[in-house]
């Protein structure tokens, strides 16, 4: 076990804050769903509380013995309780995490790194969401550990409001991203103006 601890220490950043611990996952395994499918949409008509953000997101999974999405999903189910960032932008962070983890990881030593760099359009309901011009620099490490397995999850999200306009897509409701958003209890409501889009409630 001491040997495992030494290995784990090498795949953590030295400057990260004290990680948050989560409890053990259930025994049942998850069902693998197909990767996200994106369908082109026309321009959104509702412009209320809509903002473009240039996103730089990264989720780094550190585990000497590999990992399963069952445990990642279990960790993310506790996200509301362990999130340490700006709570006006927790919905944005959840969206980025789900999209990043629905992509393909890049191996980096004993880590697997999921990255997302793109411009995303967000719409918040009512007066929710970040203040005008507000930016986000969020970084947190979350760990899951027992006698047989260790997983460290390093999450970094940078979000800056921008005026870059990209294509608009609709994500398949059976995608892994939607599965992860459900695990994180992402709060949304369907837009009354655009039936294929949702408004963030957090």
UniProtKB/Swiss-Prot annotation:
InterPro entries in the cross-refs = Rhabdo_M (IPR006870), Rhabdovirus_M_sf (IPR038617)
Pfam family, any one: Rhabdo_M2
Query: Annotated region Essential for glycoprotein binding: where?
Result: 115-151
Is Phosphoprotein one of the keywords UniProt gives this record? yes
One GO term in the molecular function aspect is: structural constituent of virion
Keyword Oxidoreductase part of the UniProt annotation: no
Where is motif PPXY motif found? Answer: 35-38
Q: Which UniProt keywords apply?
A: Host cytoplasm, Host membrane, Host-virus interaction, Membrane, Phosphoprotein, Viral budding, Viral budding via the host ESCRT complexes, Viral envelope protein, Viral matrix protein, Viral release from host cell, Virion
**Where can this protein be found?**
Virion membrane; Host endomembrane system; Host cytoplasm
Its cellular-component GO annotations read: host cell cytoplasm; host cell endomembrane system; membrane; viral envelope; virion membrane
Its topology with respect to the membrane? Peripheral membrane protein
Q: Where is this site: Involved in the inhibition of stress granules formation and contributes therefore to virulence?
A: 95
According to the UniProt entry, the note on domains is: Late-budding domains (L domains) are short sequence motifs essential for viral particle budding. They recruit proteins of the host ESCRT machinery (Endosomal Sorting Complex Required for Transport) or ESCRT-associated proteins. Matrix protein contains one L domain: a PPXY motif which potentially interacts with the WW domain 3 of NEDD4 E3 ubiquitin ligase (Potential).
Quaternary structure?
Homomultimer. Interacts with nucleoprotein and with the cytoplasmic domain of glycoprotein. Interacts with host ATP6V1A; this interaction plays an important role in virion uncoating after viral entry.
Task: Add the further remark from the entry.
Answer: Most abundant protein in the virion.
Biological role: Plays a major role in assembly, budding and uncoating of virion after membrane fusion. Completely covers the ribonucleoprotein coil and keep it in condensed bullet-shaped form. Inhibits viral transcription and stimulates replication. Plays a major role in early induction of TRAIL-mediated apoptosis in infected neurons. Inhibits the integrated stress response (ISR) in the infected cell by blocking the formation of stress granules.
Q: What's this protein's family per the entry?
A: Belongs to the lyssavirus matrix protein family.
- Name assigned to this protein: Matrix protein
Organism whose genome encodes this protein: Rabies virus (strain India) (RABV)
